[in-house]
Amino acid sequence: MKFDISCLQPKEQASFALRALYEAAGCRKYHMGRFEEYGLYQENRSFLSSEQVITFTDLDGRLLALKPDVTLSIAKTAQPAPDETLRYYYHENVYRPSAESHTFKEIGQMGLEMLGDVGEGQVRQAVSLAAQSLEQLGQPWVLEVSHMGYLFGLLDALDVPEASRAALLAKLKAKNLHELKAAASAAGMDEAGADALAGLMSLCGSCEDVLPRVEAACRNERMEAAAAELKAITEELAGAGGSIRLDMTLAGEMEYYNGLVFQGYLESLPRPVLKGGRYDLLMQKFTPGAGAIGFAVYLDELDRLSAPLPPVQQQKTEKTMLNVALPRGRLGDKVYDLLAGIGYGCPEDYNATRKLVVENPAADIRYFLVKPSDVAIYVEHGAADVGIVGKDILTEASADVYELLDTGLGKCRMCVAAPADYKDDPSRPVRVATKFVNIAKSYYASIGRDIDIIKLNGSIELAPILGLSDVIVDIVETGTTLRENGLRVVTEFMPISARFIANKASYQFKHREMDEMLEKLRAALAAKEEKK
């Protein structure tokens, strides 16, 4: 009797296919309990996707947690013998905060781990299985590959202080060139060193194009060894079926990952569906001398594949349309005029219509007209490929997007302001009125000051006048509103301007279109600056 799996949901079909793939590769199924000692996660917080964990006290008084991660538990309990390679696969649920609902969510994962004696053969097998896993999911896919050894080697060659490396890698991962150079300067690097780091941004694309440049940029043996491994892996994956891209800005946590890192994307899904890498540094916390490599497939992301296409995408076109989230208002008008001037205009005047979607198929462009505070949300969740958003909104939302360009438009600054006669009283918390709650918390935490937050949505300047707060945290452009209400700027702590952002998955499939738009946009902004 044959069982027809076509009636199953995409993630159910995938679980059958992946199980067969991993067992054929010699992997044994690993089953773990639902709970784990909280101390394991507390000691390895930076390895987790979020530090938020569901905890409870067991009947014997132990503090336990619903597992937010599987790899940590396997690494802790595997204990491979010397010269032994353990191969496990798993199908488990983990419990993490959801970006959509802002509540904890049960997330289905399948994954594979190789632990113990992990050499070149095991690494090749693991990455090959990652590519085969994407192939089993039945959609066009991209596997993005990088190497922590290459990044560490460059940081060593540039004598970058250990304390500054994590911040620099964070800017690289976000493709945030403008802030990368600022962070490099803050780390004491000279202009040549900052330019060398910035050069990693260009090492992104097809293996044929990027690998020779990766090899040419090597400065020491560590970088050369990493480049050689990347070459071997790309040769291994030459006939994999999807698209293999090198991106030397991709990085994992410094204290855990030491070799290859990779992410897999499916067309039409807004986030990576596969993540993995070599994590010897984590494994050696539990088994000295052991190595490890593995990856996880996020099955719940596949639920989107069974959803109907949104109306805006139902009219198929042979061309690739770039979907732009455009903020309504003065900033949006400035941005649109700039884009229209470089060939991305629409025949329809969006200010003369109540339509929220305007497009120009001849220019391969489609605009979504959205509230400025929602731009980052549309882009992060893949409804739009790119968008223009203020740095204030981007920081407040902590959006997981690529920040590709500082346009310099809409310049202002985030400030602490207070009545003219205000004096800080360190004996009590500062009462802060703001609509930028996360930004305010982060700033005051950085200076070690206790605060009480009062969230407001408008007329923030009124709060200290009425005694509702001591100070406000808000955007200041000219300062006129502050002065007319008897307030003064106490501290300026964050410059703000409009940023060009991109969805990370869209960038894998529409990078040519995005790069072309970026190149034209940079040229237009430079020409505009010269005219001043």
For every predicted segment, state its role:
Residues 7-25, 36-37, 69-82, 89-139, ...:
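Positively charged, Gly/Ser-enriched RNA/tRNA-binding surfaces
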Residues 12-33, 329-348:
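Intrinsically disordered, low-complexity, positively charged segments
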Residues 60-62, 114-120, 506:
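A generic structural motif
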Residues 151-242, 477, 486-488, 510-531:
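Long, charged alpha-helical interface segments
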Residues 317-532:
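Domain-level signature for soluble enzymes in the chorismate/prephenate branch of the shikimate pathway
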